[in-house]
C-alpha cells in the first residue's frame, strides 16, 4: 500500500516539478513568471496528439517537434506579454499579460481541438508491473526519468555552454551582465523559450496517462506554481523536493481520505510556507540593500 502511494506520488510530483522548473528559469533571469505555464503544457500535449494522430508520427519523433513549438510559444509570450512590462518597469503588467495570454491560448485550443477530452495513444505498454507490491505503469517510469533528464539537460546547458553561462550571468546580476556585453533581453526571451519547452515536454509525458484537452493545463499549472513556492524559486533541489512532497501528499490524501480532498493538504502547506518561510523550504531569503 505504501509502495503504491509512493510510486504514484513520485510520478505526479515529478510532473509538477518539471513544470515548476520553468517558473524558476524565468524568475531567475527577469524576476517574472509565466502564469500561462499550464497552457504551454496543454498546447504541447495537443500539438503532440496532432503529430501522432493526424500526421502519423512516432511518439519519440514527435517530442523534438513539440519542444521546438514550446520554444516558439514561450518566446511569443515574452515578446508580447512580458518585455513591454519590463521596459516600463510595471510591477503588475506582466502578471496580467501572461494570465491574459493563457486565457487566449485556452480559447484558441478549444476552437481548434474542441472542448472534449481526447485520449493520447501511449507509446509504451499500459500493463502495470509489480514492484515491491506496487503496480507501476511503464509510462509512470518514463515520466520520472523524462522529467529528471529534462532538468539535468537544462542544468548542463546552463553550466557548460556559453549561452547557458549568459543565462546564469543574467540571473546573478542583470545589470552587470548587460555591462559585460550580454544581451539580457535576448537571454530573458530565451529563458521563456526554455520554460515553455519544459512545460510542453511535460505535456507529452503526462498526456498518455490522462485525457488531453484545452482544460488540462489550468490545474497542473497552479499546482506547479505551488511547488515552486513551497520548494523555493531560487533552488532547483527545492523544486524537485517540493514536487515530490505535493505529489505524495496528494496521492496519500486521495487514498486514505477522499479524492475530493486531495488538493487540500498541498494548499495548506503552501499557506504555511508563505506565512513562515516565504522564500520556500530551500530558497534563499532576499537581502535588501539600503
Identify the function of each model-found stretch.
Residues 34, 245-290:
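C-terminal transmembrane helix and the adjacent membrane-cytosol boundary/short C-terminal tail
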Amino acid at each position: 500500500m505504501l509502495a503504491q502511494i509512493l510510486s504514484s506520488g513520485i510520478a505526479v510530483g515529478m510532473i509538477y516539478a518539471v513544470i515548476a522548473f520553468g517558473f524558476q528559469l524565468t524568475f531567475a533571469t527577469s524576476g517574472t513568471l509565466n502564469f500561462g505555464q499550464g497552457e504551454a503544457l496543454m498546447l504541447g500535449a495537443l500539438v503532440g496528439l496532432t503529430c501522432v494522430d493526424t500526421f502519423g508520427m512516432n511518439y519519440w519523433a514527435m517530442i523534438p517537434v513539440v519542444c521546438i513549438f514550446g520554444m516558439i510559444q514561450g518566446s511569443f509570450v515574452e515578446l508580447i506579454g512580458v518585455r513591454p512590462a519590463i521596459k516600463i518597469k510595471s510591477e503588475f503588467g506582466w502578471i496580467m499579460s501572461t494570465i491574459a495570454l493563457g486565457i487566449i491560448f485556452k480559447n484558441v485550443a478549444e476552437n481548434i481541438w474542441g472542448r472534449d477530452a481526447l485520449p493520447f495513444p501511449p507509446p509504451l505498454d499500459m500493463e502495470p508491473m509489480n514492484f515491491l507490491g506496487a503496480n507501476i505503469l511503464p509510462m509512470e517510469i518514463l515520466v520520472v526519468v523524462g522529467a529528471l533528464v529534462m532538468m539535468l539537460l537544462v542544468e548542463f546547458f546552463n553550466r557548460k555552454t556559453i549561452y547557458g553561462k549568459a543565462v546564469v550571468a543574467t540571473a546573478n546580476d542583470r545589470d552587470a551582465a548587460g555591462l559585460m556585453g550580454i544581451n539580457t533581453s535576448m537571454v530573458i526571451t530565451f529563458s521563456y523559450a526554455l520554460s515553455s519547452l519544459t512545460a510542453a515536454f511535460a505535456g507529452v509525458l503526462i498526456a498518455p496517462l490522462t485525457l488531453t484537452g484545452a482544460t488540462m493545463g489550468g490545474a497542473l499549472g497552479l499546482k506547479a506554481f505551488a511547488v515552486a513556492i513551497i520548494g523555493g524559486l531560487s533552488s532547483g533541489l527545492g523544486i524537485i523536493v517540493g514536487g515530490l512532497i505535493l505529489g505524495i501528499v496528494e496521492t496519500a490524501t486521495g487514498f486514505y481520505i477522499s479524492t475530493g480532498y486531495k488538493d487540500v493538504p498541498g494548499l495548506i502547506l503552501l499557506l504555511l510556507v508563505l506565512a513562515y518561510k516565504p522564500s520556500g523550504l530551500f530558497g534563499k531569503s532576499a537581502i535588501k540593500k539600503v
